Regions:
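Flexible, glycine/charged-enriched surface loops at secondary-structure junctions
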Residues: 36-37, 202-209, 325-328
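C-terminal accessory subdomain/extension
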Residues: 262-352
């Protein structure tokens, strides 16, 4: 028998299925209009069942941040997987190669040594691993820094046993709503990708995939002439600080909290940093007249312009979705105020 959301335990992670599905449809429509593909980033939720719902149409495979996520998605039957991270640890390389024996696996590479290690692991496993050369597009984290460096690396990958050169990737994850000149910075990053792509093609090296962008740069990614696919993940659920970016996506996930103490001008909730991610700021309390003042490990303090009764349920909207999911064992799927089922967050903690 279906139950109402009011029967869920406090601190539960909740996903509005209608909004989640609407977000997927909105992305699909835009991708089709601009001729782009999507590779949803599963670091957002680490939940294979949700990843499967995102696939189909313009979404042909998923993006993973860790080998653990890669393994969890492959075990659930998802067989087109990009690991958008450089891996050099021997044990992790062996695990990647094992997955590649039964699934299509692409891995970001930005160094000769990294390519050599990946090739050796592929040969030992008898598998083929596709490579995306990672280009630094302004994040100053991973990625080759010049077109000549990319050309040299591409030539090595083409000659390396067990490796297949599939294309390029470049991710600029810091361009949130508050970043000045965000569009110009994104365009500059795409220009770096275009320069590398042009240099490779001049040398007769085919570039198939050019992967990049994310939710905060979704609109810019659609308009980019160089990108073939977008790595967005948060688009399906959204975060508080993405509201000002003119995106067609709706807020779809919350955490349930309960008022456990009241003051003359506020209230205390029983959910804190151990229940909701706060890297991008305080969560929002979806309660009229209330705002979040402070959040501790197990409590959230509210300022309230009207009296709030003990036991009042308050939905908190997170500023950071991926870390919120990684704090929970399961997510409850709802339609309206009716709970349909719970889904295990299978790759929770899979940062290995």
């Amino acid at each position: 028998m279906a139950q109402g959301i009011e029967h869920l335990p406090s601190r539960s992670r909740v996903l509005d299925q209608d909004r989640f599905e609407d977000n997927i449809k909105a992305a699909e429509n835009l991708l089709g209009s601009f001729g782009k593909l999507m590779r949803p980033h599963v670091k957002t939720h680490r939940t294979p069942e949700l990843a499967r719902l995102q696939l189909g149409g313009r979404a042909r495979g998923v993006t993973c941040a860790t080998v653990g996520e890669l393994e969890a998605m492959a075990a659930a039957g998802i067989d087109d997987l990009l690991l958008a991270n450089e891996i050099v640890s021997p044990d992790k390389l062996e695990r990647i190669a094992a997955v590649a024996a039964t699934s299509r696996v692409l891995v970001a590479v930005d160094s000769m040594r990294g390519a050599q290690l990946l090739s050796a692991a592929a040969v030992r496993a008898g598998s083929n691993i596709e490579v995306l050369i990672d280009v630094d597009v302004g994040l100053n984290r991973c990625g080759v820094r010049s077109a000549p460096e990319a050309v040299a690396l591409a030539r090595m990958v083409l000659e390396a046993p067990g490796l297949i050169l599939a294309g390029l990737m470049g991710y600029e994850g810091r361009l949130r709503a508050a970043v000045a000149d965000r569009v110009q910075k994104f365009d500059a990053g795409c220009e770096s990708l275009e320069q590398v792509k042009s240099a490779l093609e001049t040398e007769g090296i085919k570039v198939g995939i050019v992967s990049g962008a994310g939710t905060s740069t979704f609109n810019e990614g659609l308009r980019s002439p160089v990108l073939t696919e977008i790595q967005a993940g948060t688009y399906a659920m959204m975060e508080a600080d993405l509201d000002g970016l003119d995106l067609p996506f709706k807020r779809a996930c919350t955490v349930i909290a309960t008022v456990i103490s009241v003051t003359s001008d506020g209230a205390v909730l029983d959910a804190g940093r151990k229940s909701i991610g706060c890297e991008n700021g305080l969560p929002e309390a979806l309660l009229p007249g209330a705002s979040v003042l402070k959040i501790n490990e197990e409590h959230t303090l509210l300022s309230c312009h009207r009296p709030v009764a003990l036991g009042t349920r308050v939905m908190l909207f997170p500023s950071k979705v991926p870390t919120t999911f990684n704090l929970h064992d399961r997510v409850w799927l709802i339609r309206g105020n009716v709970v349909e089922r719970s889904v295990p967050i299978t790759a929770r903690g899979r940062s290995d």
